[in-house]
């Protein structure tokens, strides 16, 4: 598998027995190692005889693994080619490394990207949900009409701001603040991405939730108050249960925007394709990875297919 090939060339696997073969040491050969075996005179002018020498070395050295262009193998029938252009489901979903340009074997582990996406989305929801519901309740049940008519258009306007603007705001304001507050070497982190996504999700959550609460019949509110309930008891026991379907819709729409956001996250999370251990570390999300790499991946190749599966 690509992971095993990488481990062989990283010298983490040093014997064929570890791969289910004979008890034979693995000898790794790269093209740049050829000068350790042959002199310039033996290789000829412009490395004219390099192919013959590499083929000779591969044929006579037991347990060797060579990473060289195929054109240098003069007698292909005399060697065994290792195919690394296939991606197994296990390597993809259980792989802990995403390194599509690695040689000799690219790594397409989804785990760092899935983990990064879950970290950012979860914390964005934790930040946005309490604040969004609080503002919705205030606008629907507490604020006077003058304040509501002034505040509602501003919140709706925020949902139309391009994500790159939120990204610049996060890069200029939130990232330096996090770096200073937590004494970090860099401020680009999952926390910065979560805060930016929470800000972006708030207009959707507030608008949809507030509309759902305002649809609660006035008679239900008055009946609750007539029975002696306070305003907050009425909100908690009557308005919110009646509006729960609309509140859920607003939360789901806000979460959907948080999970699928690309540009703002790409700008503030650090884009490190590693499994984060805390929210203060740089990470990379699935949408950001697809946006950053799809344009450079050869169509139909393993990298392209991995990104397609990732989406």
Residue ranges, per PLM feature:
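Flexible loop/hinge segments at secondary-structure junctions
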Residues: 1-91
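Periplasmic/extracellular loop-to-transmembrane helix junction in inner-membrane transport proteins
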Residues: 81-124, 144, 292-303
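Membrane-interfacial helix termini and adjacent extracytoplasmic/periplasmic loops
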Residues: 90-108, 166-200, 269-272
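Cytoplasmic-entry segments and transmembrane alpha-helices of multi-pass inner-membrane transporters
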Residues: 131-170, 208
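Hydrophobic transmembrane alpha-helices
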Residues: 154-161, 174, 194-205, 255-262, ...
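Transmembrane alpha-helices
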Residues: 208, 217, 231-269
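Interhelical loop and adjacent transmembrane-helix boundary motif
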Residues: 266-311
